[in-house]
Amino acid sequence: MILSFHTSCFAGTTEEIASLLLFVEQSGCTFIRNGKHYDAPEARKHIAKKYNYFKDRIHTAEEFIHYSATKSTMSGQPYRVVCNGEGMTSSDWLLAELDKVRTTILEEDHETPDNNTDD
């Protein structure tokens, strides 16, 4: 039973991380890393590369954000993102998206075929 729960949590984390990477890639936002600007697909590549490097330390989506998408390992400077003219830290932006992902998953888990009123 415990193994099943652990596996289920890992699967959920893997899905959340994949969802966040896709969100970054499709965002159309500009990412600022160490003063340089990168488009969304390039940012996704960089975050995925860091994720692969830190994978053994990452057990939650929050740890994924912390290790892979928060700040430069070299300079310590926080990553920033600019979407529609508004800037924020990439950490705040991704944590907000993670909340949306989890809310969507919870809503989908509570829907059942018996509740379908289209008949």
Which residues fall in each region the model found?
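N-terminal secretory signal peptides
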Residues: 11-53
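Compact alpha-helical subdomains of small soluble proteins
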Residues: 35-119
